């Protein structure tokens, strides 16, 4: 392929990618973070096609399988591989819809098999332990406590938390307004305890020199801008380490714990779906798996037959230990 042809193809691809980006943004209503992830993943495929001198409209299943094998070879995590392949499938469905191609080369493309993994969940005691380690005497102490109480009280995504606005707090009614994925808004109940911690934080917030355009953001950095997601990750990691929690704790762990504890307490699954902002009930149903595990451990721990079985096994072990020690004593004589 001549150099000018390469350049021409690259320019055409840029226009096409821009059109696809608009499609995801407007028709699929993806959030900016999800959109960025889609485009970054697609860029990996485009770089591969450019390197292999393959036209984007003439890609075959073999080409895509070679690309997928390359992801594995360079050590990309299986979950990330699956996400990238899912994004590529979305791109080629778009090409079909807009009549750029007639058949879908990704139809038989498979990603790596991903085992079902339940998310980490904190117990109520672990949540209390993490929050209680926050020193209110420190400069950002009250802010950090308000952040953790809000995450646990409302089950927010970290991006929803960092984008919370003062104008979206309806404390008299006991709700906050949240902008979730795809710019979809929802009202989420907030607990009296979280309201109390936020109100205490607002006193500290009033002393911050707030930068222009950030006046309405609830949670601010010491520089007077809204907190980044990374900052919230660091706050939670630090407090979990101080509390001696060995689990892999993140903002999303608080969200998982919120949903699981509600379900354990008897909350309706549909209500939990609304609070989490899940489009599909199947996404929320992951928490029924967590609840089943909890129920199983409760049955193993407390069912009378299991208690009796454990007692019998313990007695047998003690009898065997006694017999073994008796035999050893005889040998020693």
Predicted regions and their residues:
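Conserved catalytic core of the tyrosine transesterase superfamily
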Residues: 1-333
